[in-house]
């Protein structure tokens, strides 16, 4: 289970809307599956179909997270024209990154009047499992 305070959920949706029509991306840090910090990361591809996190911003988030005694609990990004479900590209990127212990959170802007967020785990074989989000 991933625990996300409403302010972080709202921030992910706001970030997604601000970057639309391009995908946004970011990192959620915390402890024990509870989000305590959100880092907006620049999508260097500036694309509506894929994202690539700015390496320096990713490193800065990593260092800040470690300094605060936290860990990465999730990576998030938006899907601007499709459901909040990992694409084949998302799965490939997760496997290549080696970050298989974190959640992958997707924000769907497919219907901008009814945005929604889902969280997934991706294992070493590329299997996708939806995980529950507990919103505070």
Question: Where do the PLM segments sit?
Answer:
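Histidine-centered divalent metal-coordination motifs
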Residues: 77-81
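Conserved beta-strand-loop surface patch within small alpha/beta domains used
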Residues: 1-72, 83-136
């Amino acid at each position: 289970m991933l625990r996300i305070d409403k302010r972080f959920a709202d921030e992910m949706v706001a970030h997604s809307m601000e970057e639309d029509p391009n995908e946004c991306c970011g990192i959620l840090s915390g402890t024990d599956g509870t989000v305590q910090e959100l880092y907006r990361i620049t999508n260097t591809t500036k694309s509506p179909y894929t994202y690539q996190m700015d390496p320096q911003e990713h490193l800065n988030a990593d260092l800040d997270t470690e300094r605060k005694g936290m860990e990465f609990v999730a990576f998030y990004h938006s899907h601007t024209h499709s459901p909040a479900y990992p694409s084949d590209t998302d799965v490939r990127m997760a496997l290549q990154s080696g970050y298989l212990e974190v959640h992958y959170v997707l924000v769907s802007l497919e219907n901008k009047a009814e945005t929604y967020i889902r969280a997934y785990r991706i294992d070493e074989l590329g299997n996708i499992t939806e995980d529950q989000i507990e919103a505070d």
